[in-house]
Amino acid sequence: MAIDENKQKALAAALGQIEKQFGKGSIMRLGEDRTMDVETISTGSLSLDIALGAGGLPMGRIVEIYGPESSGKTTLTLQVIAAAQRAGKTCAFIDAEHALDPVYARKLGVDIDNLLCSQPDTGEQALEICDALARSGAVDVLVVDSVAALTPKAEIEGEIGDSHMGLAARMMSQAMRKLAGNLKNSNTLLIFINQIRMKIGVMFGNPETTTGGNALKFYASVRLDIRRIGAVKEGEEVVGSETRVKVVKNKVAAPFKQAEFQILYGEGINFYGELVDLGVKHKLIEKAGAWYSYNGEKIGQGKANATNFLKENKPMADEIEKKLRDMLLNNQDSTPDFTVDDNDGGVEETNEEF
């Protein structure tokens, strides 16, 4: 016991010295950390929030969203911004691709008058802006669109055709080391949009990879693979995309789940359509033939009419959403619209035919 008491005294002295040198909170017992419950922001898709396990994207962390062209990457991040703004949070969009459409952003519910936007000239400038905003503690959500467009200064000042091996990867690696701690301290969510490239000469396995080196893969708490798997049609007219998102890495809940939802052109994620689908699946909404009803009240004939009814009756939609979140997020053994994939968390191939 005497040895234990001596150890306790030595530990207390060491902790006191560390806190004196580096400040209070620089070391603590894990159970004393009041930030253990991760705060989240909704993605705008109920099935994706449930697939993520925590109810959305985690604050104070780095998130990577990648996929092929026109798969819905920017749309998903704009929906996250809209949800964050509705919760009273401040958001910034680093538009490295110089392609953000403010009209489309407004249609998705983004308050563009209060959205901070930067169109940096170089990758270093973009990442320095991210770091400055994170250190300020005044910005809650940062989006970088995209990693592939973060061009190192040396490459911009050089000639086309010059070789710049590993420059972008080194830049990203250094930025991740600086950003990770600042994001945690300020509880800022940083979302990187990324593109897919093909590795040359891969005979077996998946040839797909993401740009910017490996650092982002390690530092990201959540990685989402988003793909277009089909079209949404009204008659012969294509009005949207059927979209599948796979959670290929998740440090805040169980990974490898997936969600499917519709992205409607000019409207964004078909949230009320998800409510109908998940409500029927989990027996909150009754379906008899083509008719849908909730608590004995008919809400529409056909999914489109039921969706429009919920859109116009927000209290009922909010009630269904709350019941689904309570049922599915508090019981992580249940799997709604998604399945578990046995992969290693990398980019994976999909053989969907459109």
Curated annotation (Swiss-Prot):
The UniProt keywords, alphabetically, are:
ATP-binding, Cytoplasm, DNA damage, DNA recombination, DNA repair, DNA-binding, Nucleotide-binding, SOS response
| Keyword RNA-binding (UniProt) | no
What are the GO cellular component annotations? cytosol
Q: Can you provide one Gene Ontology molecular function annotated for this UniProt record?
A: ATP binding
Compartment list: Cytoplasm
Under the heading SMART domains, the entry gives: AAA
Superkingdom assignment: Bacteria
- Pfam families xrefs: RecA (PF00154), RecA_C (PF21096)
What InterPro entries does its record include?
AAA+_ATPase, DNA_recomb/repair_RecA, DNA_recomb/repair_RecA_CS, P-loop_NTPase, RecA-like_C, RecA-like_N, RecA_ATP-bd, RecA_C_sf
CDD domains, per this entry? RecA
Disordered as annotated region, ranges: 331-354
**Which positions in this protein are listed as binding ATP?**
G67, P68, E69, S70, S71, G72, K73, T74
What segments bear the compositional bias annotation Acidic residues? 339-354
Name the coiled-coil region(s): none
The GO biological-process annotations, alphabetized, read as: DNA recombination; DNA repair; SOS response
Which HAMAP family does the entry link to?
Answer: RecA
Q: Which PANTHER family match?
A: MITOCHONDRIAL DNA REPAIR PROTEIN RECA HOMOLOG-RELATED, RECA
Family from the record: Belongs to the RecA family.
* Known function: Can catalyze the hydrolysis of ATP in the presence of single-stranded DNA, the ATP-dependent uptake of single-stranded DNA by duplex DNA, and the ATP-dependent hybridization of homologous single-stranded DNAs. It interacts with LexA causing its activation and leading to its autocatalytic cleavage.
Write down what this protein is called: Protein RecA
Instruction: Give the originating organism.
Output: Cronobacter sakazakii (strain ATCC BAA-894)
